[in-house]
Amino acid sequence: MSAGRTFEGAGCVTWWGFGPARDLLNSDTHKVRLQEELNVLLVGSGDPRHILKTITGLTHSDTLHVWVIENSMEVIARQLLLLYISLLPPDKMSVHKKTEVFLEVFGNLEIRKETEESVKKAAAQLSISITYSLSSDSLSHSCLDTSLLKFKERDELVRIFKLWERPPSAPASVSKVWDARVRQHLGSRYDSRQGAFDWDLNMKLHQRGCGVINKHQYAKWRETGVTFEMREGLYQTANQSLLSTRVFNHRGNGVALRGYWGDIVSSPYLSFGIETENKELLKTQNNHYVKTAQDISEVNLLELFECLAARGRSPLNEDPPNTSSSCCQSTESRKTEENSQSDPSASQTQPVEHSPTQELDLLNVNGVKVSFLSPDSLSKLPLKSKYRNLFNTIFCSASMVHQLDSALREIAAPDAALVIELATFLLDLSKEQVSGFAVKVKEIAEESGFTPAHDQNSDKYAVFTQKNN
């Protein structure tokens, strides 16, 4: 059963998750046994939220290997782009600017010209590095591994990155593309769409625990596809990373159309903006949240990027930092970084523009590696001895649940956890369908040799642990 396949609101391409970021090795419902290397398999996560969150929970001695399967190369390309931005060293981009750029690329169909330049630069470097990996056994970066993809898949990645680097000179209006999706989804309700937006927010998202999503910001996204506006400026440039090709049947012939085929109802706020450990951000006044999902997304990502900077090291720095005490930078070092960003003389010492190199000039995050697997690889993993009993945690999105079967037990490590995204935030589903989906998920997990974890009270994810034989 796949809850997210053809429901028009959710779209057919998963650009972001339908649930908040989780530490997949350590949570209230399960803790993975510590060992030399921890292996996590992500099936259809759509974005790097779980990767970033899981890294924050690592100790200085942990080694983490994340294996990623997505259902299209366009989603893999975007995952690589978002990880590239996440791993930019502080001397290239401060954590504050990185947070803004990440969120803009992550959730906005239209971005600022400055942000487009960041995307083009990243695409150019990723294209060169993957081309290099095609002719060499060496990895272009210790954390990002595309070597397990087929040659034709890596060729496809290069094609996508070059399209981002040099987009069409006369592109179709993405605002019209977005509006066409909204019209198709709402049908006769289009002329009263503000009422439809309010209904989805108040009667669905707010009722399902997303009260921090602001009415005006949500309506702006539903109307225009622009989610995050941290800076004043013109958000008028197409975000190429959110555009993909879909083949339609026209009079018996396949017609490929490039457009936006992702979510138009649930919102990008779900990944980073609806949960926080900082209770100050959840304060209310007159029964309204003082802060918004955008504010929470900014704070959460800032903390995640500070953790990456503390665990990682610049390619020019041979000595890894001490991460045994805390993964967050000190306030003093953060101030120093901000001062260097605002000091004109400091900025003059930085290189202005360099042509892309084979080596990705990114943070080397100590003990962390992310490997991308082919979209059709899930059913083939049990056939390869290297994956047998390998994964400590297996995550599966709501849109990919239909691919799970009893072969899971062959690739799951002893005491492994299975985490499945539920359909709570697929707004086109009725309450009965959401409940039915949860029942189906439980059946699939049990048939695969897993049992529900104790003390579960989440309606966002179902967590299972491997049965003891």
UniProtKB/Swiss-Prot annotation:
The keyword Phosphoprotein does not apply. Residues 313-356 are annotated as: Disordered. InterPro entries: DNAAF3 (IPR039304), DNAAF3_C (IPR028235), DUF4470 (IPR027974). Keywords: Cilium biogenesis/degradation, Cytoplasm. Residues 320-331, 339-356 have a biased composition (Polar residues). Pfam families: DUF4470, DUF4471. Required for the assembly of axonemal inner and outer dynein arms. Involved in preassembly of dyneins into complexes before their transport into cilia. PANTHER family: DYNEIN ASSEMBLY FACTOR 3, AXONEMAL, DYNEIN AXONEMAL ASSEMBLY FACTOR 3. Belongs to the DNAAF3 family. This is Dynein axonemal assembly factor 3. It comes from Danio rerio.
